[in-house]
Regions:
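Glycine-rich beta-strand-centered segment in the early N-terminal region that forms part
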Residues: 20-34, 44-93, 130-132
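Short glycine-centered segments of the SAM/dcSAM-binding site in methyltransferase folds
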Residues: 77, 161, 241-243, 269
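NAD(P)H dinucleotide-binding glycine-rich loop of Rossmann-like/cofactor-binding domains
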Residues: 84-165
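Local beta-strand N-terminus motif with an aromatic residue
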Residues: 116, 216-218, 292
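Mid-domain Rossmann-like dinucleotide-binding core that forms the NAD(H)/NADP(H) cofactor-binding site
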Residues: 133-210
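Glycine-rich cofactor phosphate-binding loops and adjacent beta1-alpha1 units
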Residues: 154-156, 186, 192, 196-267
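C-terminal substrate-binding/catalytic core of Rossmann-like NAD(P)-dependent dehydrogenases/reductases
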Residues: 250-298, 306-307, 316-317
């Protein structure tokens, strides 16, 4: 089959890769759309160790399920969690399988991902997509689940003041989700087209260079996760406020000199947000309350995946999608 993979340290695109050899309890999915993620970029650059197929965020149709299929997934359109823990592990039993250090992860560490014509995923990680949600929306299920998780981590009574730092895809999704959850939200970014998009959504927005540091925000969602953005977040948060670091990928662990004095002085809480309920993300997609139109900056055929990865590295891109069925 055609696949985008790392072999002997090189990125290869094309046919000749073996189809998945699925075991009992695994669904073989024909991939329709793949959303290029930061993790994919880290793998392609050699920052994240991997041998095999890239790709984590996708939507596809289940061709077959090996063994019993009690959920009748065969023929259904699905999305999948990239985190694949052993269901009987201690953390999985406690509902935290995505944090199991022994878990497999799609597209990382030797586990074949979804940037191919077919991908094999345990049925427990598959989530059916409702008939009314088309693939171009369903492909956002994973980043949307993460944005929703970031919003749910911090629960403040009333109408909290929330600032979202950044204007990347996860920031734009988080701003919409938080506004829907009755927060007073503003997004601070630098790109005029992203700020214009917020205006159409009814989300408050400003250029980040124009924002003051009044120390009055209940929650700061930092989607950039840099030393500079963290310093800005500390200056905006109220005493005993919360900073949520919204991310997805191990290769973001760059060492940076962050001044932690404000965290101590102002008694700030700093929380990481990486995982999320894919089912809740799909349900939010089904509701149709989020505006996802125009978030796909460019789309590519599977054979043009190298160009897609380059495009995804461009800060002017919001979301890059590969049509794996072309």
């Amino acid at each position: 089959m055609r696949a985008v993979r790392i072999q002997t340290g090189s990125l290869i695109v094309g046919a000749g890769y073996p189809e998945p050899d699925a075991e009992t309890g695994v669904g073989v999915v024909r991939v329709l759309r793949v959303l290029i993620t930061e993790t994919d970029l880290g793998v392609a650059r050699g920052i994240i160790p991997h041998t095999g197929v890239l790709g984590q965020a996708f939507v596809g149709v289940v061709e077959r399920v090996v063994g019993p299929d009690p959920r009748a997934l065969t023929g259904r359109t699905v999305v999948a969690s990239p985190d694949l823990p052993e269901p009987t592990s201690d953390l999985a039993r406690r509902g935290m399988g995505a944090h199991d250090p022994a878990r497999a992860v799609l597209g990382v560490g030797g586990r074949d991902g979804c940037l191919a014509e077919l991908v094999a995923v345990p049925t427990g990680a598959l989530v059916a997509v409702p008939p009314g949600v088309d693939p171009d929306r369903a492909v956002f299920a994973l980043p949307l689940a993460r944005a929703l998780h970031a919003a749910q981590i911090v629960r403040i009574p009333g109408k909290p003041y929330v600032t979202v730092l950044g204007d990347n895809l996860r920031a734009l999704l988080a701003a919409q989700v938080l506004a829907r959850l009755n927060a007073s939200v503003r997004l601070l970014g630098t790109m005029p087209d992203r700020l214009d998009r917020c205006a159409r959504w009814g989300v408050k927005h400003r250029h980040r260079d124009e924002a003051g540091r009044w120390g009055d925000q209940d929650v700061i969602i930092d989607s950039e996760r840099s030393a500079e953005s963290f310093e800005l977040a500390c200056g905006m948060a109220r005493p005993r406020g919360t900073i949520v670091l919204l991310g997805e990928t191990p290769h973001a662990r760059q060492r940076s000199a962050c001044d932690l004095a404000p965290v101590i002085e102002r008694e700030l809480s700093v929380v990481g947000a990486r995982c999320g309920s894919l089912g809740e993300g799909v349900e939010l997609l089904r509701s149709g309350t989020l505006d996802l139109d125009g978030l796909i900056t460019r789309r590519f055929r599977l054979d043009d995946a190298k160009e897609a990865l380059r495009a995804a590295s461009d800060p002017s891109s919001i979301a890059i999608v590969v049509d794996a069925d072309r």
